[in-house]
Every structure is written in C-alpha cells, then in structure tokens.
Amino acid sequence: MADQPNNAVNYPALAVPHIQLHGVVDDRMYDSFKQQLTGAPVEGPIVVSITTLGGDPEMARAMGDSIRLLRDYTGRETLFLGKVAVYSAGATFMASFPAGSRFLTRGTRLMVHERLMQSNIQLNGPLNTLSYTLKAKLNEIEDSIRIQDEGFADLVAGTRVMLDELKRKATSNWYIEAEDARDLGLVLDVI
C-alpha cells in the first residue's frame, strides 16, 4: 500500500465526511445517520463514510432511501466513502450511491453475500390449512430474493460486473479488495 499514489488529494471533499457511520448496521446506526444528516450543510455535496461488518439490511436500505431522496429532491451530489470493511449490509447501503460517487480507502474490503434467513416452520392444525403456512413462508422467501436482487442490480449498475456474476459469487461471500473494486467499476477510486 505504501507505493500507491496519494489519490486523496484529487478528492478534497472526502477529507472530512459529513456523516460518519461505524459498527453494526442497526436502529442505533440509523438514528445516528438521521441526526448527522440533519446537521449536515444545506449546500454542496454530502459525504457519508461507513465502516461495518454488516447488520440489518432493511436499516441499510432505509438509510439508502434517505440518500436517494436527498439526491432526487435537491439534486445534491452524495458521495460514499467506505473505510476498512464494508461488509454485508454496508454493501447494501453502498448500492444506494451511483458507482461514480463511491470511494474506498486503501486496504478496504467489500463483502457481498446473499441475504440470510433462519426460520422454523411449525405445522400444526387441520391438513387443509397447512399449505397456507408453507405458501406464506415461500412468499416471504421469494419477496426477500426480489429485494436482494434489486439491491444487487443497484450495486452493479454502471460497473463492469454483470448481475449474474455477482449473484453467483454472492452465494459464498464475495470479498473484494479496494483496488479490485475500482478495477471492476464498483467504486470510482481508492484513496
């Protein structure tokens, strides 16, 4: 890493992110995100940094929706800066930023995987009603897959990664080093 050029000088806006997130993606991170977003400058680009080993993908999607709405309603530029580890729900959040607005610090790793589910199905009752329980669980699984695939499509939009490739690699936790992410177009640059 020491022999790499200092690309940070090309992106001075990334020096002090307006929103700095770290830890598990959960309700507390979402609350911190909303509070920091409220305190961010009202003009110019908004820079969001994150370091996370993952967490709740729905909280990541909620934060991402806030970023998307900010862009859509104000036209403001939003920049993503991943630091050290952007795993799981962190990559879900990263997908809410256009590929050309994403950056990673040197040595950072991304990790993308399929959504996980742990569930038990209790079948109890008249036989004619049991199929409804199974169908309800199947509907939940199928909708979760659709949500996952929408996020995967957002993550690879405008990159050199094909959606089918991402889906194939995500089955076994795809770890991507910062420089590889840049070369694949998943991020604009590494600083």
Locations of the language-model features?
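Terminal-region recognition feature
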Residues: 1-191
